[in-house]
């Protein structure tokens, strides 16, 4: 399918602060051309079934903590799936046609939820914040923000930042790249509350693994340095209108491959 920009599409407004988030940083680092299509050109994309399943599981895990601790069980989580999926389809009616085998769809979501209960016991703690929006005016030119799946504050004050992933954990040696997202959240929390989070935790439901890290102030300083470098690179790309593609194995899953200059002479 050939994608064309709509004539009514909003242009990038250069006199507004650059909005940065972990996902936007990752997009630009992986492929500036993809960043341009999504952020600058604002080209529409159809929903991804994997992403929508992730949204469904995230919603159920969010709502699970509305229950009393004794009712935070695998069965009560699974019972939330149909109603949350209906709400998701109301928001995106096109999902109704995309999911051709609803039983298989629910079975996979149920499997991810059952895996969650092998990694944590949600009856044993209270989630202080869910879907917490952290933001900071990084500078006059940069607005940094992100949404934390869950943030727990212990009675003794220690802070744990948790992110659910419905995919598999990164291979050994690639954990640092995965943890960058949570280090950005830790930096945002530190800038807002002057408290250094005690633990960063990525929960991978695809293979039942957990990646943990204890951040330090030097970690946050290094993260801030990366953010400023990426922002500087984005501003340079905007000024030059230069968005070089970075061909990789990810291209086969990219919706914009048909219009990407790396794949079209």
Feature-to-residue mapping (PLM):
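Short, compositionally biased low-complexity segments
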Residues: 27-35, 52-56, 73-93, 195-205
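Short acidic (Asp/Glu) and glycine-rich catalytic loops that position anionic groups and cofactors
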Residues: 34-41, 58-61, 88-91, 162-166, ...
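A non-catalytic, helix-rich entry segment at domain boundaries
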Residues: 60-130, 137
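Generic recognition of stable, solvent-exposed alpha-helical segments in well-folded globular domains
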Residues: 20-23, 32, 52-59, 104, ...
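Mg2+/Mn2+-dependent nuclease catalytic core
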Residues: 132-224
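Nuclease catalytic cores
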Residues: 25-26, 30-70, 106-114, 127-132
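Metal-dependent nuclease catalytic regions and adjoining charged, substrate-binding loops involved
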Residues: 1-3, 7-10, 19, 75, ...
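An N-terminal structural lobe/cap that precedes and organizes the functional/catalytic core
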Residues: 15-16, 20, 36
């Amino acid at each position: 399918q050939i994608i064309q920009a709509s004539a009514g599409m909003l242009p990038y407004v250069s006199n507004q602060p650059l909005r940065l988030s972990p996902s936007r940083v990752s997009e630009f680092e992986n492929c500036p051309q993809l960043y341009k299509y999504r952020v600058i050109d604002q080209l529409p994309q159809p929903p991804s079934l994997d992403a929508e399943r992730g949204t469904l599981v995230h919603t159920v895990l969010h709502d699970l903590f509305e229950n009393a601790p004794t009712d935070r069980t695998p069965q009560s989580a699974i019972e939330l799936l149909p109603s949350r999926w209906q709400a998701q389809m109301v928001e995106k009616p096109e999902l109704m046609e995309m999911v051709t085998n609803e039983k298989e769809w629910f079975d996979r979501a149920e499997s991810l939820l059952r895996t969650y209960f092998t990694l944590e016991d949600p009856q044993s703690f209270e989630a202080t914040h869910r879907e917490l929006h952290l933001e900071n005016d990084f500078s006059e030119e940069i607005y940094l923000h992100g949404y934390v799946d869950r943030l727990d504050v212990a009675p003794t004050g220690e802070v744990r930042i948790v992110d659910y992933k419905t995919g598999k954990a990164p291979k050994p040696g690639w954990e640092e790249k995965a943890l960058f997202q949570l280090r950005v959240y830790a930096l945002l929390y530190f800038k807002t509350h002057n408290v250094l989070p005690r633990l960063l935790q990525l929960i991978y439901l695809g293979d039942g693994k957990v990646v943990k890290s204890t951040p330090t102030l030097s970690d946050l300083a290094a993260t801030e340095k990366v953010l400023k470098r990426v922002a500087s690179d984005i501003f340079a790309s905007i000024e030059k209108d230069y968005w070089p593609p970075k061909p990789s194995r990810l291209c086969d899953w990219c919706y914009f491959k048909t219009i990407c200059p790396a794949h079209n002479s």
